[in-house]
Every structure is written in structure tokens, then in C-alpha cells.
Amino acid sequence: MSVTVAVGMFDGLHRGHLALFERSLARAQSGRCVAISFDPHPDVVLAKEFRALAPLTPLPEKHAFLARRGIELHVVPFTRELAALTPEEFVEVHLRAPFAPDWLVVGEDFALGRGRSGNVERLRSIGQEAGFEVESVPLLSLHGSAVTSTRIREALSLGQVAQAAELLGRRYRLLGTVVHGDKIGRTLGYPTANLRLHDEKLVPAHGIYAVWSRLAGEARWRPAAMSVGVRPTFGGVVRTLEVHLLDWEGDLYGQDVEVAFVDHLRPELRFDSREALIEAMAQDIIHTRQRLTAAVPEPPGDA
């Protein structure tokens, strides 16, 4: 049985990554297709000073996403010792010994090993000795720039969730469990579900968003407005994720809820009165309905 291995961080599993996986599956044909990724992110390990970097795609999500496409995920712990390996050592320990691949598929700008010396040209040379061929997949460009995880991070950090969706090829999602909050939304006439995320994941910028929401075990997406922020009107300092499901009533405590970001409505604001906040929330609901009318929900398994 033939074996094809793709190597990369694959954070975000964006359109560029999907193009690479398409080539990997084509090379594998009916054989085994493996994706090697790393955890934690190399930028966290190699940074001179501590750097927090929440992933775009937590490992459980990455496993599920690839499994649905017939790809096995193999996670290599990223350490300074791993980064110090020569390309030949990396290939022997993490490619040839466990998988004996027939094909290695990487992006055209990919490099591994000490000092990132294992570029495509060197990997092809190593492959001739180790018995595998190398295919490099061109970077995918959109609006004049390469599709990268960095671009997606930048878009989300600015609240540009529609742009992030264009780069990803699907809407950015968060999954969490509904926990008890202080029920401020209920006193304002807009009860919200407070989400505690299952896994560490990058959260878009503070603000109000139009989202599709889905309850665990359901295929149906429900329209919702979401607040990401600290609730400055009430002197908050801790970030909360609050979802108001439109035209829905019920007890959500303890249930899992997934949200898919459609559009950014406005930044988080501090209001001078509860009345002003309530009026703004009413407008948020109107704008949410307008945005979602033109935004068809994606299939539940598309994440």
C-alpha cells in the first residue's frame, strides 16, 4: 500500500492547506495519507521571550477535520531539540522509520530542520536516498497575497471575520459549553448563553457579531447575535463570550453550542445608561437578521 505524507503546521486548515491535501490524497490514491503537524506552535517554542499564541485550529478540531477527509493526523511534539535536528535526522526519525513514505507533499516555501535548511530542493535530494519523491505545492494567492495563517490571525484580530472566512474557505467557528453568568442580558430583555470554550483557540476582536449557532446534537443552524468583550458598561474586566439566539427560548446550561462567525456589526462600546445599551442591542438584532438573511448556513461538518 502506498503512503503519502504531508508535513506542516496546518494551523487554520485554510484554503492553501486544502490545496496541499488534495494533492496528497491524489498521490495516495487508495493508499494511506498522513499529515504530520506539530504542537505547540514552533513560534512559541523558538521565541526569545514568552509568547502566547492561541491556535486557529486546536488539535481535536484538526483531528476531526482531517479524519473526515480520510487523512490521518500525526502530531510531533515541537521542542528546541527537534528544531536542532538536521533535515536528514528529521526525515529518518519522523518520516522514514514510522511511515516509509512513497511521497512527501509540502508547500513550496516549506523548510524543516536546523536553521530551516531542509527546503524543497534538499528534501528532494534526501528523498532520492531514502526512497521517496517530493511534490511541492504552490502557495495559493487571494487578492494579491498568499493565503497564510498569519493573514487569518490578522483579520480575526481586527474583527474581520468575513475576510477570515474567505481565506479559510469556510466560516471561523468556536465551540463551547454554556455556563452560568451574571444574567445581565436577561435583565435587559436579551438573555444570552455564556460560552466556556472547549479548547484554547483564537477569539476574534471584541465586538458584536452576526453568527449562526448550533446546539450539540442538532444539524440545524439558528440565527444569533454574539458579544465578545468585557462589558465596559458594567465595569467588566474579564472577557466573556455571550450568544443571544434569536426567536428561541429554553435552558441551555451545560449544553455545547457552536457558533460560526458571519459578520462584524460594531465594536464593543461603553454606554452611559442601560436604556442606551438596550436601544443599541435592539439595533444589533435588526442588523443581525439583515446580515444572516443573505448568509446561508454551512453544513455542520464543514468545519
Language-model segments: which ranges?
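Phosphate/ribose-recognition catalytic cores of enzymes acting on nucleotide-derived substrates
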Residues: 181-303
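ATP-dependent adenylation/nucleotidyltransferase module used to activate substrates
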Residues: 64-67
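Glycine-rich, highly charged phosphate/nucleotide-binding loops
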Residues: 53-62, 83-91
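A conserved beta-strand->alpha-helix junction
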Residues: 36-40, 73-82, 138
